[in-house]
Amino acid sequence: MWLLLAVFLLTLAYLFWPKTKHSGAKYPRSLPSLPLVGSLPFLPRRGQQHKNFFKLQEKYGPIYSFRLGSKTTVMIGHHQLAREVLLKKGKEFSGRPKVATLDILSDNQKGIAFADHGAHWQLHRKLALNAFALFKDGNLKLEKIINQEANVLCDFLATQHGEAIDLSEPLSLAVTNIISFICFNFSFKNEDPALKAIQNVNDGILEVLSKEVLLDIFPVLKIFPSKAMEKMKGYVQTRNELLNEILEKCQENFSSDSITNLLHILIQAKVNADNNNAGPDQDSKLLSSRHMLATIGDIFGAGVETTTSVIKWIVAYLLHHPSLKKRIQDDIDQIIGFNRTPAISDRNRLVLLEATIREVLRIRPVAPTLIPHKAVIDSSIGDLTIDKGTDVVVNLWALHHSEKEWQHPDLFMPERFLDPTGTQLISPSLSYLPFGAGPRSCVGEMLARQELFLFMSRLLQRFNLEIPDDGKLPSLEGHASLVLQIKPFKVKIEVRQAWKEAQAEGSTP
């Protein structure tokens, strides 16, 4: 027994003792570190981690490192360094670390979001981008699909006139149906049990990821039971069962003559690979049903919660700034009126609305810290050495709240994205990366930007979004997981009188 214990302790020491660094190399300044636990005792435990990491820059500078268990993580808090990692050396830092909870979510690093650098990630990212390219023109045009769901959402909200409601469920339905159409070419009905199941799965996954899981830091603990791991396995199993049912139906009815969604593109790539009619990057093994499910799961997971959260943040800030909301509605009334729906082509005309969206993405970034990158080779950031296998995290919160880059960064000021005349959109700082950048940038950025503009312009054209009668304003603090979520709140829905009058005139014989 003592021999086994000695072997176990020696193994732990080998795994968690700081590794020898390259002689003469200059590394980022590091937090203190202890054997086994690393820097864990020296990291702030209270408050939101992205803010804590930002605070640590005061002592350690815009790039510093710390150890969690056996892993070294480098934290980036300046846009020049972030752009070097994401763009200039994007390929060198395009890896993803293995994390216990995310390995379960991604079926051992399959799919796109959490997949490590390699042929499978490159292939599935390319196929996903090909799928979005399907929706540029014609009946499958992305704008048309978004407008269809925006119509359904607005028609539902019209039935809630005078009521104070939580927008989460109707928004989630609308955005889920947009993603569903891109992936499968069909939409869910509000009462569909599969829709509710998908929403529950997404909520459950985010709940697990919002909590610190020791197994993510100390993989050796996998020999012990973990409630978080069991929950994640259950959510992923439920999600995969739902998606696999759709996949099987799609495979049965598949025709190469009609490629209209992401799943069709994945199946066609599999058919081509099986028939030796594909490029060298399309290995059939990388297009198994499990790989397809992981990619579809990524698109659903990233596409629904992110857009839904940002729209709720925008509404919340407008409730806090009613005069801004009124100015945006005045612009919509003058430029669009009530006889047509807003279009993407109006984005450069409704500049105050677009500036408001951009400011919300700055002050409350979707992901306050980007998903960790990993150095796939020995590299550097600035004049500092970064060893192969080092995790690198860009603190987007730090970039978006730097006093050196943004005047009064904690104040909500959409005008910072407008020129002095207030008529032209501008890019006021390079310290702004709401969707990341480079090889690991968000594949759905174009979709998200269109959704945010079209949904908000439609909502403000038809409705007054008001503070509930109890006078309770939404909290602007947020709750960080993979996504910075706003705390639940209600908004009073009122159909605008000008909209009613315009509709009455339009229906008059």
From Swiss-Prot:
Keywords: Endoplasmic reticulum, Heme, Iron, Lipid metabolism, Lyase, Membrane, Metal-binding, Microsome, Monooxygenase, Oxidoreductase, Steroidogenesis. It catalyses: a C21-steroid + reduced [NADPH--hemoprotein reductase] + O2 = a 17alpha-hydroxy-C21-steroid + oxidized [NADPH--hemoprotein reductase] + H2O + H(+); progesterone + reduced [NADPH--hemoprotein reductase] + O2 = 17alpha-hydroxyprogesterone + oxidized [NADPH--hemoprotein reductase] + H2O + H(+); pregnenolone + reduced [NADPH--hemoprotein reductase] + O2 = 17alpha-hydroxypregnenolone + oxidized [NADPH--hemoprotein reductase] + H2O + H(+); 17alpha-hydroxyprogesterone + reduced [NADPH--hemoprotein reductase] + O2 = androst-4-ene-3,17-dione + acetate + oxidized [NADPH--hemoprotein reductase] + H2O + 2 H(+). InterPro entries: Cyt_P450, Cyt_P450_CS, Cyt_P450_E_grp-I, Cyt_P450_sf. Its cofactor is heme. Pathway: Steroid hormone biosynthesis; Steroid biosynthesis; glucocorticoid biosynthesis. GO terms for cellular component: endoplasmic reticulum membrane. Its EC number is 1.14.14.19, 1.14.14.32. Heme binds at residue 442. It is found in: Endoplasmic reticulum membrane; Microsome membrane. Substrate binds at residue 202. One of its GO terms (molecular function) is lyase activity. Regulated predominantly by intracellular cAMP levels. The 17,20-lyase activity is stimulated by cytochrome b5, which acts as an allosteric effector increasing the Vmax of the lyase activity. One of its GO terms (biological process) is progesterone metabolic process. It is an enzyme of class 1 (oxidoreductase). It comes from the Eukaryota. It holds the Pfam family p450. A cytochrome P450 monooxygenase involved in corticoid and androgen biosynthesis. Catalyzes 17-alpha hydroxylation of C21 steroids, which is common for both pathways. A second oxidative step, required only for androgen synthesis, involves an acyl-carbon cleavage. The 17-alpha hydroxy intermediates, as part of adrenal glucocorticoids biosynthesis pathway, are precursors of cortisol. Belongs to the cytochrome P450 family. PANTHER family: STEROID 17-ALPHA-HYDROXYLASE/17,20 LYASE, STEROID 17-ALPHA-HYDROXYLASE_17,20 LYASE. This is Steroid 17-alpha-hydroxylase/17,20 lyase. The lineage of its organism: Eukaryota, Metazoa, Chordata, Craniata, Vertebrata. The gene is CYP17A1.
